[in-house]
Amino acid sequence: CPMYSPFSELEHYASRKLSKPYILCEYAHAMGNSTGNLREFYDIMNRSPHMQGGCIWDWVDQGIDAIGRDGRHYWAYGGDFGAWMYTHDENFCCNGLVSPDRTPHPGLMEVKKVYQDIEFELVDDKVRIHNNHNFTDLAKYSFRYDIQCEGKIVYQKALEGVKCAPGEYVDVT
């Protein structure tokens, strides 16, 4: 099972006519701000039917609820328990998209944005709406957009009943 494959390898696999799926058992390591290249992975995976996706490492920080000498709460991990005495993964224990108590880290917002089921892009003077759902038409959704100039709304429009089949896009004005 591949993990952390370079984009060139993914592009090569995606460009071939193959029947076997390609699934990354681990990708977009969430340590710090390293999920920042998630969009590139997602775009490659969506270009080919046999690119099946993968698993972001890591979902949750693996820290232990602790109170410091100063009385403040913190998530203990690795060397907090005597690095000189034990083998440990140092800060590779706290490298997830959410804290041990499931508080979201900023990187989770990037994942949410990249994985969204409905995408919008400006194409010339139209808004293109992409329906990334597998089974749901967009007609059940309501949309609204604003046009702003120097932070002030100069135009608003509501869109109701936009028909767009799964996997398709529609341009609206």
Protein language model regions, located:
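Extended substrate-binding grooves/exosites of carbohydrate-active enzymes
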Residues: 1-125, 133-139, 144-153
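Intrinsically disordered, low-complexity Pro/Gly/Ser/Thr-rich segments with frequent PxxP/GP/PP motifs
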Residues: 142-173
